[in-house]
């Protein structure tokens, strides 16, 4: 195989994407499981659920942090590795990514900070609300990123003008059937992955303690 600059760029981008995407579904899935655990604690007042929540929260936060860092690297590589593509579709591709960064990511970051630093400082009901808002933020984040990805798979709402793609219908971007297919697939897969990962690690720990 001839390792020219394009092939090397593809290999680098593929490695970054694969590494990044391991943490994305894992953090989405574990986030929902942690939220369910804390909800059970609030409802049943059983300290076992609180211990479970705090234990898995550490793993969720680590996965979330690594996912954010690798995601930033991936976004930089769009400009560094595929600058021609970025110039061609930047007006369209950048819009959902900007919404994701300015709205969804800030929502996640704000409430994950409130959730992390307000144990025993706010009421349990308010505290569990924070983690559910984090989960809502991850859904929004995934949605807008998948809007950008769905345009790559099935371009809609654009026209070619002077050799560049220009947006003609912003609503068409996030109402495309492709977005629905990708979003349901990714979120369902993430929740399943999170549940299986937690169940698997818990099963290993139970076997070790026998």
Language-model features and meaning:
Residues 1-210:
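Polytopic transmembrane helical bundles with strong interfacial aromatic enrichment
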